[in-house]
Amino acid sequence: MHYQLQQNALLPLLARTLSLNVFYNFVRDAFKAQALGWEIPSLCSVVKTMMGWNYARTAAVSRERCGGMGFLSSSRFAEYLACAHTCLTAEGDNRVLMHKIVKDLLGAVASKKHELPKPKLNVKAQIGSMDDVSSLEYLSDLFRFRLSTLCQQIVAKMAALNKQGMTDFEVAMMGTSDLIQDLAQAYGERRMLDSCVDFLGTLAGENRRVMEGVFRVAAIDCVKRDLGFYVREKAIKP
């Protein structure tokens, strides 16, 4: 782990795994309390997809980073990869679940059952002019900005395609599929980060400092993956 190659490949996966575990605990408690109404099926669906994909990616990348030892049965990577396959397909294909998540989200927003959380800062005017956006406060605002922006974009595109005569099925499967996947992921990752921030409130001292660093790494990795979106939308400086 002293090598930069290992750190850059494995530490973001570890940070995301820990963050997803906090998110899973939040969803489990919400399901038990049945306190979030319409959102419960969406939360259960999105945490299942996110943890399944993370499991598959972690197993694949970790096997590669172990080199030849990754082929040994004692390393158990074959077992992990087989289990990850189940995570991706059991109880509904993950990509199909993402469609359900967006359908429920857009329905809740349209019916006023749900209001998308707003960033605390003006993302384009303030965060978009900063040299360092790595604090949890700024990262949280960026996640919320991505969610609301994608939601606006997909609503506008769906309406335009409907006017062109496309059916709802054609719009979802042939016209806005990429946006649907991005929006569902943005919804899940925003919920994940919010649950991590809430969890930090229960910690103090060194525990809080360490876990804040973990959650920042997980969030920064998401922003790095979607950097093109943030630069295009002027939410981050080029």
Regions found by a protein language model. Name each.
Residues 1-238:
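Flavin-dependent oxidoreductase catalytic core characteristic
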